[in-house]
């Protein structure tokens, strides 16, 4: 699992699972007493759900899917023949629903257990759909 920290806008992002056709990330951000949490599935163009965003929204998400967007990543300059434009379907959920209690969970302390469990279940579901095998 890797972690990234952005000092301009305090946020933490963990890669909970990285597969060949998708990754699952958890993001924690905010300031003292008002933290926000998100879980995202980043679905690549070689995953069966990439062309079916409606089905992707039905994945295991806390409170349902609250975010979906196709994201295009492009190289600033193409120097090599392997460089190309990449598209990702990013779908996710937040933990800011009525009766959620994660506002006090500081990302400095890591991912709260419930959120990590949700992210792991999402990864298992995406693995099953993709036919990939977990090599951990």
Segments predicted by a language model, with ranges:
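Acidic interaction surfaces
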Residues: 1-136
């Amino acid at each position: 699992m890797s972690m990234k920290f952005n000092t301009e806008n305090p946020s933490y992002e963990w890669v909970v699972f990285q597969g060949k056709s998708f990754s699952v990330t958890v993001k924690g951000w905010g300031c003292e007493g008002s933290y926000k949490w998100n879980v995202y599935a980043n679905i690549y163009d070689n995953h069966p759900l990439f062309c079916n965003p409606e089905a992707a929204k039905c994945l295991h998400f806390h409170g349902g899917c609250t975010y979906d967007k196709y994201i295009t990543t492009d190289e600033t300059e193409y120097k090599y023949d392997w460089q190309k434009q990449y598209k990702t379907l990013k779908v996710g959920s937040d933990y800011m629903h009525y009766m959620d209690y994660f506002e006090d969970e500081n990302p400095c302390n890591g991912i709260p257990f419930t959120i990590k469990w949700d992210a792991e279940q999402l990864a298992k579901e995406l693995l099953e759909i993709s036919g990939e095998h977990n090599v951990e």
